[in-house]
Amino acid sequence: MKFVDEVSIHVKAGDGGNGLMSFRREKFIEKGGPNGGDGGDGGSIYLEADVNLNTLVDYRYTRRFDAQRGENGGSKDCTGAKGDDLILPVPVGTTVIDANTQEIIGDLTEPGQRLMVAQGGWHGLGNTRFKSSTNRAPRQTTPGKPGEARDLKLELKVLADVGLLGLPNAGKSTFIRAVSAAKPKVADYPFTTLVPNLGVVSVGRYKSFVVADIPGLIEGAAEGAGLGIRFLKHLARTRILLHLVDMAPLDESDPADAAEVIVRELGRFSPALTERERWLVLNKMDQILDPAEREARKQAVIERLGWEGPVYVISALERDGTEALSQDIMRYLDERTLRLEEDPQYAEELAELDRRIEDEARARLQALDDARALRRSGLKNAGAVDDDDFDDEEDDGDGPEIFYVP
């Protein structure tokens, strides 16, 4: 199944049925009077969050959806049948945006939640409606109203409690394998992870949280380089971010430099996202045998970042330190939930932060889309470099194929 997290579709609700002009005509009833019925309402279009879906790939191939038109009115005061509503299933976590105004129509965050995106047309009136004491044989009717038509943009953001940040090969997928039953692909080359992966982490007998891994970020990601920038939006709804740093990289690069790249690119993508609760997780420390060297590398990263938050030293491969980290995450999430219920000011501050993150992420991605459109139309700036992989339509046949649908 191909992972598609953005699509554009056109929806058209059903038109209302026309009212009928008709008169009662029976033997021995010379002037039976009007009996034209009303038309039926047009069908509306709804989006429904379906917990069994995790991609918008179905809407990549079919992009126009029309609801059924209401039937016209009939004689003998018969009302036309209402057009059937059209229900379009989408994954939980889908944001619906009006493509013309960029207005957010709604957010589908709960299984079974429905959102009307196109209102069916109102029915027309038959001539019976216009009968009066002075007009006993009206010849007036009204047509049905046209159904609402809209161009929509659907954006999927996975719903997770914890988001993982890091360069390619920082050990994010290995971490998910260590703490959950998820089995994302793991290898010793960059960009092994091509789509977001989710894992459910069980803590104790009855508690759990969801962790999301996205493709790694690289230098220049905020300008569209690599794969990770497109998927950073999936971290917008997380409650806490884990910044994983490879402390023993194969190319012997400085871990402090790698950590600094992530913080810088995160800030360029969304300054508000840097205000989200974030913990520093130093991975692969088991590969550094000298305790003094281990401590020196740890302090170098902390000092370079000016870090004052929580720091964890783990080995995802050996599962060393992962259990304690998972328990602390669960404890933080429980305390956060309790505080949200008891402190309205804290809840409002988090809601405002969420809004800022959503707005900044959408603005950044829209800017990248606009720049890509300019390049494709031959107006590429002299200094611009089209180094992202999302307009690559060739299938190399190796691994999953990724589609970005503008």
From Swiss-Prot:
PANTHER family: DEVELOPMENTALLY REGULATED GTP-BINDING PROTEIN-RELATED (PTHR11702), MITOCHONDRIAL RIBOSOME-ASSOCIATED GTPASE 2 (PTHR11702:SF31). This is GTPase Obg. The gene is obg. It is found in: Cytoplasm. The lineage of its organism: Bacteria, Pseudomonadati, Pseudomonadota, Gammaproteobacteria, Pseudomonadales. Its main location: cytoplasm. Its EC number is 3.6.5.-. Pfam families: GTP1_OBG, MMR_HSR1. Residues 385-399 have a biased composition (Acidic residues). Keywords: Cytoplasm, GTP-binding, Hydrolase, Magnesium, Metal-binding, Nucleotide-binding. CDD domains: Obg.
